[in-house]
Regions:
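SAM cofactor-binding core of SAM-dependent methyltransferases
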Residues: 55-163, 190-193, 276-281, 285-288
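Rossmann-like AdoMet/SAM-dependent catalytic core
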Residues: 28-79, 83-86, 94, 148-149, ...
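Short, hinge-like loop/turn segments at secondary-structure boundaries
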Residues: 127-130, 152, 179, 202-204, ...
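A short, conserved alpha-helix within the catalytic core of class I
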Residues: 167-180
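Conserved hydrophobic/aromatic beta-strand scaffold that supports enzyme active sites
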Residues: 160, 183-185, 244-248
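N-terminal auxiliary segments of SAM/dcSAM-dependent transferases
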Residues: 7-43
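Short, structured coil segments at secondary-structure junctions
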Residues: 104-105, 179-180, 231
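Conserved beta-strand signature within the Rossmann-like core of class I S-adenosyl-L-methionine
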Residues: 181-192
Length: 326
């Protein structure tokens, strides 16, 4: 009986000594098979010519949606002189637009997050030693963003700037003047539609979900396009999930096999939901827009405070056939 008990315990815990190795493998996912699959997909993307839109080259390794594929396609199309990136709002950097770029293409970069726990987590990973990565802990504001960028000591023309802070994105991007990225990736809020120049009002300590519904944040695609046009960029489209917009510096547009598009042409309504009813059931289609009805926004054309007109946005998206469900 005792012998059987010993055998049972031994079999039950025979892998206990391997736990450190398993944890190490999971943590160091730059060695994982998904990276190898991403490398194969990236190689295939090099031969994709005459694509109709960015969705044709999407694939996901570490990005939240298909942005890894879009980025790989763009850096193969464009003669980017400085292989550098800046991304903020990365949390622990496990899911990010530039992580695969860092690992696969050996770019150098700066990542910024407002949580010291997240930044310490990044610095504890082997990729922080194996690759040229800087991680800075700071809650980004209009007054500190340029100094944070300057501290990275990159040339003014960096390769990619990725802006995703779930809130003051428009105001922070507007403030940045220390770098001129070849590619700008900026999160937009599709619930504002494509016609309205809307953004949330700037607030230094804005935290998504604190004062308003979780789905009320960021800016409209129209506002992001207007802002980047003034900075010398052309809009080439959005990812198919409907949360990231892509802008290319005008000097580099000629190298692309796809054209600049209008807000209406490039707009994508978000496929995911970040809005719920009182019972916690996810809202879909037009109900996501109605969840932010009459909330205060800034019209980036006039600078005036307006109120979200959900029905006007819904009507324009229906007319343009931009919604899969109503």
């Amino acid at each position: 009986m005792m012998s059987k008990l010993k055998t049972l315990i031994r079999n039950k815990f025979r892998y206990i000594n391997q736990i450190p190795q398993i944890a190490h493998y999971i943590q160091n996912d730059y060695k994982s098979p998904k990276v190898n699959l991403g490398q194969i997909q990236s190689a295939a993307n090099k031969y994709k010519k005459g694509i109709k839109n960015l969705a044709d080259v999407e694939f996901q390794v570490f990005s939240q949606f298909g942005d890894d594929g879009i980025i790989q396609w763009l850096i193969n199309e464009l003669p980017i002189p400085n292989k550098t990136f800046i991304e903020f709002g990365v949390e622990n950097y496990k899911e990010a637009n530039t992580r695969f770029l860092l690992i696969n293409n050996y770019w150098s970069g700066l990542v910024i997050d407002g949580s010291i726990e997240n930044v310490n987590s990044i610095k504890s990973e082997q990729i922080y030693n194996f690759y040229d990565l800087q991680a800075s802990c700071s809650f980004i504001t209009k007054s500190n963003i340029n100094e944070l960028i300057t501290s990275a000591r990159f040339d003014k023309e960096i390769g990619i700037l990725s802006v995703d802070i779930d809130g003051n994105d428009y105001w922070i991007l507007k403030e940045i003047n220390r770098v001129q990225p070849v590619i700008i990736i900026c999160e937009y809020n599709s619930l504002f539609g494509y016609e309205h120049p809307y953004t949330i009002n700037y607030k230094d300590d804005f935290v998504r979900g604190n004062d308003y519904p979780f789905s009320f944040y960021g800016s409209s695609l129209r506002s992001a396009i207007d802002l980047t046009e003034k900075k010398g960029y052309g809009f080439i489209g959005c990812n198919s999930a409907g949360n990231n917009a892509y802008f290319i510096k005008n000097d580099y547009i000629k190298y692309l096999s796809i054209p600049i598009v209008s807000a209406k042409e490039g707009y994508v309504f978000s496929s995911f939901t970040e809005a719920w009813d009182k019972e916690g059931t996810p809202l879909r289609g037009m109900d996501k827009i109605r969840a932010i009805h009459h909330l205060p926004v800034i019209n980036t054309d006039t600078g005036e405070i307006e109120r979200v007109d959900a029905e006007a946005i819904i009507n324009s998206l229906q007319e343009a056939k931009k919604m899969k469900r109503f």
